[in-house]
Design a protein with these regions (language model features):
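Electropositive, gly/pro-rich neighborhoods at or near active sites that engage anionic ligands
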Residues: 2-187, 299
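Conserved beta-strand scaffold positions in the cores of enzyme catalytic domains, especially
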Residues: 48, 172, 192-195, 245
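Residues at the C-termini of beta-strands that transition into short coil/loop
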Residues: 52, 95, 197-199, 249
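Structural motif
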Residues: 169, 221-222
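A mid-sequence, solvent-exposed acidic-amphipathic segment
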Residues: 176-220
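Glycine-rich beta-strand-to-loop/alpha-helix junction loops that act as flexible
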Residues: 226-228
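C-terminal functional extensions of proteins
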Residues: 230-300
Length: 300
């Protein structure tokens, strides 16, 4: 083994971190913290459309994700929403692109190397539309547990998130086996809950049916959407029609992991957990309260 091979594990991370810091300083993005993002939602009653690495892969490249294959129409819409100028829609980017304090080592490393490959491309895309200096929300408000060193962050964020639907009627648009809020108290302070069940995979392929169903069943409720990349587009379209819609992503699973003090991304019984090994059969949910909330099923 030569000296280069010996020093490489030390040298490469140092150089990568230095380049990452240089990117952030030279082309900074204005991204609110998780708590400031929630305060903004509470004050302005706006909708949110979130972008993580999966949405970026579809929007900026010809890639798909685990539960949504690449779709050129979805890619086009994700590009459009990313550049939205609708004041009723808060576009959200990962706060880790601005500040990594408090994140665990795995999350820091992931977003550092992601940024080395994609940050300049993202900034260039935003700048072309004059959006580089726009203020963005934090896409990680629905993922406050697994990427963080301390559980206190998740406890604060979830406590504030619950204020958004305090005593409000909710319409959930979710994958068939997502079961948002079932078996825990995440939504226990809501006044009422209705559910539209959608395909667990490739939901965007049924997008028009989903959009029509929401229009049919909406009666002033706050809309919570857990539907992969399709949720980003749906939240934007609903905001354009005067509805408040929140793309909540993995919020329920993160809440379950927090309650369990999970150290790994474990399977949650009775719920589809795409980031864990889904070898177990999820099965049907016989909870009568959950079944009574379902107003529509749009399945593959």
């Amino acid at each position: 083994m030569n000296i280069k091979q010996i020093l490489r594990p030390i040298y490469v991370p140092i150089v990568a971190k230095a380049k990452f810091l240089s990117l952030r300083l030279s082309q900074p993005l204005r991204i609110m913290s998780a708590e400031d993002t929630i305060d903004y939602i509470l004050e302005h009653h706006c909708s949110i459309a979130r972008y993580g690495d999966g949405e970026f892969n579809i929007a900026l490249h010809d890639y798909g994700v685990v539960f949504q294959g690449y779709n050129p129409s979805l890619s086009k819409r994700l590009k459009e929403v990313l550049l939205s100028k609708n004041d009723d829609l808060l576009v959200c980017l990962p706060h880790a692109l601005r500040d990594q304090r408090g994140l665990n080592r795995h999350a820091k490393t992931f977003w550092m190397y992601w940024s080395l490959n994609e940050y300049e491309n993202l900034v260039r895309h935003l700048s072309a539309a004059g959006n580089q200096n726009k203020v963005y929300g934090d896409a990680s408000i629905t993922r406050p547990y697994k990427d963080w060193k301390r559980i206190e962050h998740a406890e604060r964020v979830f406590a504030k998130l619950k204020l958004i639907w305090e005593s409000r009627d909710i319409l959930i648009v979710e994958g068939e086996q997502t079961r948002l809020g079932v078996g825990n108290d995440l939504l226990s302070n809501a006044s009422s809950i209705k559910r539209i069940l959608c395909p667990p995979n490739n939901a965007f392929d049924q997008y028009d049916l989903i959009l029509d169903s929401v229009a049919k069943h909406w009666n002033g409720e706050l809309i919570l959407i857990a539907l992969g990349p399709a949720a980003t587009v749906l939240a934007a379209d609903l905001a354009g029609h005067g509805m408040q819609a929140l793309d909540v992503g993995h919020m329920d699973i993160e809440y379950e992991w927090m309650l369990r003090r999970s150290t790994e991304k474990e399977q949650i019984p009775g719920k589809y957990t795409n980031e864990a090994n889904n070898d177990e059969s999820i099965g049907e949910c016989a909870d009568p309260q959950y079944l009574s909330q379902i107003v529509c099923r749009i399945l593959e």
